[in-house]
Amino acid sequence: MGFPKVERLLINYKTLDEFKKFKGCGAQELSMLEELQANIIENNSESPFYGIYYGGSLIARMSLYMKRNGGEPFEITGTYLELYKLEVLPTFQKQGFGEMLVNYAKGLQFPIKTIARIHSAGFWDKLNFQPVSVPDGDFYVWHPETNLNAVTNEESA
């Protein structure tokens, strides 16, 4: 068995069955079952769901949406990712799988916005997310680091 990796989840009935394993493990607000069912009904082929399989079973998952700031009062301008929900099955928690999912999202090199749910503020702090407070509520933001050593085409000419 190879090392687990993050992969985009297919929108199908197999994934729906895998999501049912998470029902009752976490908070209702983290449930993605209804979200997946809606995507199956709409025959949406662009899955917003990502997960980690271990031993053939889904053990961790997140939903990730591409958004564009349309004047909302927070620190992100332009295109960003909203990491809407992240959940790891209890048996596999505190083994780095949640961090693997977040690092996958970070690797896409867009700012990320997320809401800290279920006493997870320490997790987001550890992963260098910054807390942001606005009238609508609190959330966390991560910005990709600018590579100061990058050379543009104009500079190299």
From Swiss-Prot:
Entry EC number(s): 2.3.1.-
Pfam families: Acetyltransf_1 (PF00583)
Disulfide bonds: none
InterPro entries: Acyl_CoA_acyltransferase (IPR016181), GNAT_dom (IPR000182), YlbP (IPR017274)
GO terms for MF: acyltransferase activity, transferring groups other than amino-acyl groups
Domain N-acetyltransferase: start-end pairs: 9-146
Domain of life: Bacteria
Record bears the keyword Ribosomal protein: no
Signal peptide: none
Protein name listed in UniProt: Uncharacterized N-acetyltransferase BCAH187_A3974
Organism (species): Bacillus cereus (strain AH187)
